[in-house]
UniProtKB/Swiss-Prot annotation:
Keywords: Cytoplasm, Metal-binding, Zinc. It holds the Pfam family SprT-like. It comes from Lysinibacillus sphaericus (strain C3-41). Zn(2+) binds at residues 67, 71. This is Protein SprT-like. NCBIfam families: PRK04351.1. GO terms for biological process: response to stress.
């Protein structure tokens, strides 16, 4: 889906759900990170996170567009357009728009892999796993008091 198709989708949803035209611009903004979309108060444009389409498809985009159009139409009419406003919450229920979008952040793999040190006793082969490297000259086996050696 590109910006032109998104613009047509927003205009169609606006007419079907609100019976009012959407006369401004709707486009994808790849810089959005944690939000599905946003309504810009000064320009009246709507920005949509392209990651929402990639992860969840057209159904999620339609929900985000409905939500942002609630902000849009209430702001244009001079009514309460913020999330905390009663008029906004009522309009969300009326058009069956979601209050929140699905989670967009994918869990990143841990950057720093936890390092483990494995020691073994020379006499009885008792294993010791430690996060912090230790001086084998200073410590001995707790079972037989034998010498320790680093495996990894």
């Amino acid at each position: 889906m590109d910006n032109e198709e998104l613009q047509q989708l927003v205009c169609r949803i606006s007419l079907e759900s609100f019976q009012k035209p959407f006369i401004h611009q709707a486009y994808f903004n790849g810089r959005l990170r944690s939000t599905g979309g946003r309504y810009l108060l000064q320009s009246h444009n709507i920005e949509i996170n392209p990651k929402a389409f990639e992860l969840y498809g057209i159904k999620e985009i339609q929900g985000i567009v409905l939500h942002e159009l609630c902000h849009y139409h209430l702001h244009i009419e001079g009514k309460g357009y913020q999330h905390r406003d009663k008029e906004f919450r009522e309009l969300l229920k009326k058009v069956k728009a979601p209050r929140f979008c699905s989670a967009l952040h994918t869990s990143k793999p841990s950057i720093k892999k936890q390092r483990r040190y494995t020691y073994t006793c020379v006499n009885c082969q008792q294993l010791y796993i430690r996060k912090i490297k230790m001086n084998v000259e200073k410590y001995c086996c707790s079972k037989c008091l034998g010498k320790l050696e680093l495996l990894k």
